[in-house]
């Protein structure tokens, strides 16, 4: 039980990493929450800071979910039947951390890329197919 609590805390703290907020401070010295939509997420980062910062924030947001599901979950000694459950739990808590981050007043992003990272960690082939489909639709329809 103690290991499960540790996984939950570490996953939440990992999900709470405010990558968009840090990108705004590092690239332009601004608080991203005061610009664009005011959201601390990847979309607002692309809109306000440009594609380079947007790609960096997207990568970190994706990594937060993947890392929690793939590595933090391994703290719990797992039986093969429970590995997916523990990985999903760690990932979901990372998404909650992204949406309600401790480090930035519990106001975060929407969690889509962090959830995508969880999918990459738990069901990588399905995640890659879904992301590929999304990108094809995005670039062909521009919507």
Question: Residue ranges of each PLM-predicted region?
Answer:
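Hydrophobic, well-structured mid-protein blocks that either form specific transmembrane helices
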Residues: 79-113, 118
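Interfacial segments of multi-pass membrane proteins
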Residues: 46-50, 72-76, 93, 111-141
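Helix-coil boundary and interhelical linker segments in multi-pass alpha-helical membrane proteins
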Residues: 1-7, 67-89, 120-129
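Alpha-helical membrane segments and adjacent membrane-interface helices in multi-pass membrane proteins
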Residues: 51-76, 87-99
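Hydrophobic residues within alpha-helical transmembrane segments
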Residues: 10, 59-63, 125, 129, ...
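N-terminal signal-anchor transmembrane alpha helix
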Residues: 2-27
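Cytosolic, membrane-interface loops and tails of multi-pass inner-membrane proteins
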Residues: 22-52, 108
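C-terminal ends of transmembrane helices
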Residues: 20-23, 97-107, 134-142
């Amino acid at each position: 039980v103690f290991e499960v609590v540790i996984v939950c805390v570490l996953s939440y703290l990992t999900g709470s990493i405010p990558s968009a907020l840090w990108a705004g401070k590092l690239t332009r010295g601004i608080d991203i929450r005061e610009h664009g939509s005011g959201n601390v997420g990847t979309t607002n980062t692309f809109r306000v800071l440009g594609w380079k910062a947007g790609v960096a924030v997207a990568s970190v947001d994706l990594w937060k979910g993947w890392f929690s599901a793939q590595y933090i979950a391994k703290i719990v000694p797992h039986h093969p039947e429970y590995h997916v459950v523990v990985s999903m739990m760690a990932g979901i808590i990372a998404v909650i951390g992204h949406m309600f981050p401790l480090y930035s007043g519990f106001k975060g992003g929407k969690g889509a890329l962090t959830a995508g990272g969880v999918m990459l960690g738990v069901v990588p082939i399905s995640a890659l197919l879904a992301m590929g489909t999304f990108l094809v639709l995005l670039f062909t329809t521009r919507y």
